[in-house]
């Protein structure tokens, strides 16, 4: 069986509802537009569940922006997925989330519509990410700012805890980008 990636996810994995005909993940961006994740094929991705009122917000957002600015022209992309499952720390509407991320933290990377990352209603992408790289205490996402690093082929390379600073994984990003 071929290794599954975030770009081509079969219907039978995790008994998910049928995926689109091309078996690609699709999510809505913060403006409600459908985005096929296959558009990021060939890029190194850092996929992060974010929140605006978390204790990790003020450290993670600026570091994510720094990484994005530094490597966006070398094939690096950050995909931010707001989530309100941890302490209700992302209560805003999608519009409020966009204003917060893009104005306060100058986020130029894609911000998606709010998703669930755990439970029966978890976003299919997050079900796949968690099954690909379980955490220290099982597959569940434990808090905001859990990060998944995905290579250019869509394979999940690593998972980082919320306490892991984005800048501390720069070496892993550089390795996947083949940057000295």
Curated annotation (Swiss-Prot):
- Cell inner membrane is among the record's keywords: no
Q: Per the record, what are the reactions this protein catalyses? A: a hydroperoxy polyunsaturated fatty acid + 2 glutathione = a hydroxy polyunsaturated fatty acid + glutathione disulfide + H2O
Q: Where in the cell is it found?
A: Cytoplasm
**Gene Ontology CC:** cytoplasm
One example GO MF annotation? phospholipid-hydroperoxide glutathione peroxidase activity
Please provide the record's keywords in A-Z order.
Cytoplasm, Oxidoreductase, Peroxidase
Q: Which residues form the active site?
A: 54
TM segments?
A: none
* EC numbers, comma separated: 1.11.1.12
Against Gene3D superfamilies, the record matches this protein to: Glutaredoxin
Q: Which SUPFAM superfamilies match?
A: Thioredoxin-like
Top EC class, one word: oxidoreductase
Question: Which domain of life does this protein belong to?
Answer: Eukaryota
Query: Could you tell me the Gene Ontology terms of the biological process aspect for this record?
Result: response to oxidative stress
This chain's function reads:
Protects cells and enzymes from oxidative damage, by catalyzing the reduction of hydrogen peroxide, lipid peroxides and organic hydroperoxide, by glutathione.
> What does the sequence similarity comment in the record state about its family?
Belongs to the glutathione peroxidase family.
Record's protein name: Probable phospholipid hydroperoxide glutathione peroxidase
Instruction: Tell me the organism.
Output: Helianthus annuus
Q: Which gene encodes it?
A: GPXHA-2
């Amino acid at each position: 069986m071929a290794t599954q990636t975030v770009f081509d996810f079969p219907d039978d994995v995790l008994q998910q509802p049928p995926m689109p005909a091309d078996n690609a993940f699709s999510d809505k961006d913060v403006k409600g537009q459908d985005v096929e994740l296959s558009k990021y094929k060939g890029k190194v991705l850092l996929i992060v569940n974010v929140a605006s009122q978390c204790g990790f917000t003020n450290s993670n957002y600026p570091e994510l922006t720094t990484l994005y600015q530094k490597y966006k022209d070398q094939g690096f992309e950050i995909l931010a997925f707001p989530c309100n499952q941890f302490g209700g720390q992302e209560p805003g509407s999608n519009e409020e989330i966009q204003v917060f991320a893009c104005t306060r933290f100058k986020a130029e990377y894609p911000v998606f519509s709010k998703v669930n990352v755990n439970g029966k209603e978890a976003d299919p992408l997050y079900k796949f990410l968690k099954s690909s790289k379980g955490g220290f205490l099982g597959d569940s996402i434990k808090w905001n700012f859990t990060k998944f690093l995905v290579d250019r082929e869509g394979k999940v390379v690593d998972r980082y805890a919320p306490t892991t600073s984005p800048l501390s994984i720069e070496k892993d990003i550089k390795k996947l980008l083949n940057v000295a």
